[in-house]
Each structure stands twice: as C-alpha cells, then as structure tokens.
Amino acid sequence: MLQNLCRALAFGSALFAATASFAEDRPDQIVIRYAPVTEPQLQPIAEYVKKAHALEKAQILLKPLRLPRPLKIEMRGCQGEINSWYEDDVVTICYEFLDDIWKNAPRETTPAGVAPIDAVIGPYVDVVFHEVGHAIFDYLAIPLFGREEDAADEISVYLTLKFPKADAHRLILGNAYQYRSDLVGHKLPLSLEKFANEHELGAQRFFNVLCLAYGYDPKLFGDVLKKGYLPAERADDCEDEYKQLNYAFDKLIRPHIDQQLAKQIYEAAWLPPTTMRPPRRLGRHSRPASAK
C-alpha cells in the first residue's frame, strides 16, 4: 500500500514538473541583432542583408517555436572566418558566410532549375534553421542518436518543407546547390580532416537533402530523380527516411510549436520572383571549411 502511494506521488511529481516546464515555454522568443561592422570589405554584405530584413524574416519564421528563454540570432564579422554556430543561447552567422553564399550563386538559372536568387535564399534559410536546430536540442533537452550535426541538417530540411510547395521546392534546390558547390570546390583526393569533420561531406549532405525532400513528396520533387540528381537506389528508401524524421519531430519537437501561429506564418508565400537577381560579389573571401 505504502509502495503504491509512493509510486503515485512520484508519478504526480514528474507530471507536475513536465506540465510546469511546458507552461513556462512560450512563442516569440527570438531576439535579433546586426552587429556593427568594422571590416570595410564586409560593409556591402552587412548593409544588403540589413536592408533586406534578413533577420527580421527569420524572427517571424521562428516565432511559433515555444522556448523557455530568449534565443538571440546575431550577424557579425568573424575576422575572415566563413562560419556559423550556436553557443550559450546565441546563434552567430558570420557576414563572411553570407558573402560566400552570394559569391557562389550562379549567374543564370541552372539546368536543375535553380534560380540565382534561390541559390542565395535557400542556403540562408538552411543555416538559420540548422543553427536554431542546435539551439532546440539544447533548450529542450532533445535526446539524440547519432551526430548532432546530422540531426540539425534534418531539422533544417524538415522545417523548409513546411513552406508552401512552390517555395519549398525552390528553397530545397537552392540549398542543395550550395552543398553541390562545396563538392565542386574541393580538391581531390580529400584530406583526412574532411572525413574526420563533425559534418558530413558536401556531397553527402547534397544527397541527404534531396532524399528527405523526395521522401516527403515524390511528385513535387520527382524532377531530382528524373534528372539523375538523386540515384534511384537511394530514392527507394527516402520515404522511410522521411517517415522516421517526421515521427521523431512529432514526438519530440512538435509539442513545443504553436501550431496555430505556425499555420498562419508558413502558409504565406515568402520568396521573391525567380527573376530577381542577387547582387554580384559583395565582398572578397575564399572558400572555407563547412559551417558548424
């Protein structure tokens, strides 16, 4: 009898703690900051992203996320390092990283149908969602199997696929283009450091992005299979890969998202027309290692 009472009290305490934790979480916890630029070569890109309200748009997209405390997203110069990372409740995106995205965007629409503007916005959305994915794992104590970097990649793809279908297709292809550019930019044979890195190789991330997208909607992303960008052997398993991701998201993260707010935000069309052209060469930086 006493043992059963103790069990009931323990269960009640755990339930109360979990309920209290959820009650403390709330949406609209994203804080943004454009850090002042001291490097003259970064001034053009810093001015451009601020004028485009890049962080304000990210703030809106992440507004439905229920967090226990504020999360800051900051853009700043990184002394020439092309990188992004999450640490101590702050997502940092280097202006050098954004400049590199612009530098590697194609001048014309590619044979795969990637417009220049999509090759800019796609990777930007990806890096925001990827680094915020790291923050989600930290803030919400999300249990992970495997590498955290892979899980952050998957969170980014998952959230991108929640845009309206036309926008999602453009963003996914734009993101994949950047990973393909990483592969093209590497010299072969690859160094051991590339294989030992916490990130997968650009080529692997390229196929992972396309696979999850194809698994989500084979009709919408059927072109990546028809054009040979996604091998048929991999495509056979993509639906199951997406189902696994969707199941994990439903169990672990969806309870921390304001569904009504998310529906309002993600049903809107976000992207400019494909005819819009990004500015060419806003700064001068060489190709770096992958972002964190």
Predicted segment positions?
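Short alpha-helix carrying the canonical HExxH Zn2+-binding catalytic motif
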Residues: 117-136
